[in-house]
């Protein structure tokens, strides 16, 4: 896996192509991403870099993390994220180095991970797109009910993974193979075609696409 970035979802807008076609884009504000740790094959058993992004009050940093940042000599960040390096990545990374939006370029495909908007406890129609049952014809209390959830005495249980009512959203989600439309190095912005997980202001992780 190649190195990525941690950014903040700033919202959505649109750009216009030369032929006038509107392209919906998500604007991601990339704050300073600083390398806080470099993991090596000899010491840690695998190669990776750990980056920290954003800013946070000193009172909001626990003692183990405060010591970790102090040892690295970097300012404590709001988010800590690790990127595993593969054998083809021969770049030399040092603690304290900054990773900027220039690691991506317009036209590149990326995967964006974030925490989806929480919708609370939802029924099967909203959560799983089930069809409603009859409004009339003798149906009185089961208009939005799921219906049968199993078989008979065999197997005598409900199978794991059965689509039922429950907590919707508020999960880690990755949207794959999104196109980078524009990179603004001066303002630290990434404009990515389409929607990405999370609410405005949420932290997202952008990595080169694994399926590109």
Swiss-Prot record:
Q: What is the recorded post-translational modification?
A: Methylated by PrmB.
Function, as annotated: One of the primary rRNA binding proteins, it binds directly near the 3'-end of the 23S rRNA, where it nucleates assembly of the 50S subunit.
Which PROSITE patterns does the record associate with it? RIBOSOMAL_L3
> Which taxonomic lineage is given here?
Bacteria, Pseudomonadati, Pseudomonadota, Gammaproteobacteria, Oceanospirillales
Q: Which family does it belong to?
A: Belongs to the universal ribosomal protein uL3 family.
Self-association and partners: Part of the 50S ribosomal subunit. Forms a cluster with proteins L14 and L19.
Segment Disordered: which positions? 135-155
**Which of UniProt's keywords are assigned here?**
Methylation, Ribonucleoprotein, Ribosomal protein, RNA-binding, rRNA-binding
PANTHER family, per this entry? 50S RIBOSOMAL PROTEIN L3, LARGE RIBOSOMAL SUBUNIT PROTEIN UL3C
Tell me where the transmembrane regions lie.
Answer: none
Citing just one GO molecular function, the answer is: structural constituent of ribosome
Q: What is this protein called?
A: Large ribosomal subunit protein uL3
Q: Which residues does the record list as N5-methylglutamine (modified residue)?
A: 153
Superkingdom, natural source: Bacteria
One Pfam family cited in the UniProt record for this chain: Ribosomal_L3
Checking InterPro entries in the record gives: Ribosomal_uL3, Ribosomal_uL3_bac/org-type, Ribosomal_uL3_CS, Transl_B-barrel_sf
User: What HAMAP family is this protein classified in?
Assistant: Ribosomal_uL3_B
């Amino acid at each position: 896996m190649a190195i990525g970035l941690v950014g903040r979802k700033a919202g959505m807008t649109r750009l216009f192509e030369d032929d006038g076609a509107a392209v919906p884009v998500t604007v991601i504000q990339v704050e300073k991403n600083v390398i806080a740790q470099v993991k090596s094959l000899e010491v840690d058993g695998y190669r990776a870099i750990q980056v920290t992004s954003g800013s946070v009050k000193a009172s909001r940093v626990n003692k183990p993390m405060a010591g970790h940042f102090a040892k690295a000599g970097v300012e404590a960040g709001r988010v800590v994220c690790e990127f595993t390096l593969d054998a083809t990545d021969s770049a030399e990374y040092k603690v304290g180095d900054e990773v900027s939006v220039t690691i991506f370029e317009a036209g590149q495909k990326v995967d964006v991970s974030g925490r989806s908007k929480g919708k609370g406890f939802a029924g099967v129609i909203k959560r799983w797109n089930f069809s409603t049952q009859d409004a009339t014809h003798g149906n009185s209390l089961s208009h939005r009910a799921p219906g049968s959830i199993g078989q008979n005495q065999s197997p005598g249980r409900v199978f794991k993974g059965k689509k039922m009512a429950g907590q919707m959203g508020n999960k880690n989600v990755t949207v794959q193979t999104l196109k980078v439309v524009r990179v603004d190095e001066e303002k630290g912005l990434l404009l990515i075609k389409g929607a990405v997980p999370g609410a405005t202001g949420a932290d997202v992780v952008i990595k080169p696409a694994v399926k590109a």
